[in-house]
Amino acid sequence: MLDPKSENPEEECKRYTQLFLAEPIDIICLGIGENGHIAFNDPPVADFADPETVKVVELDQACRQQQVNDKCFESVEKVPTHALTLTVPAMMSGQYLFTVVPGSNKKNAVHHTLRDDISTKCPASILRTHENCVLFVDVDSLPVEA
């Protein structure tokens, strides 16, 4: 597990990268954020060709607000401004990707994931290029046209 409270985030990224790269990854479970982010790879700063495996990122206001909406924190002020995240290429390296996206607040993100051009405007759109990605949605998050 990544230690988000590590005293040295850069060293924690290196430690986890070594673990991650030690063996092939069979399954990666992930979600899609309200703005189309995957992990903390927010639009438009997500990098589909990122050379890193794990990195420190600055969380934008939309991502921080989602942490409150998801009841992870009581207020935006309590949400950290930075986080550790797997990069997009690291996630895409899994043999199977199981993506769970429940809730009406994710309907637009699911629409953009499935319908928009593949770009960092909706980082989750890259999931369409993975041959073994399964998207699990509920009635509330399913776009009408899907």
Report each predicted region and the residues it spans:
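Conserved phosphate- and dinucleotide-binding cores of soluble alpha/beta proteins
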Residues: 2-146
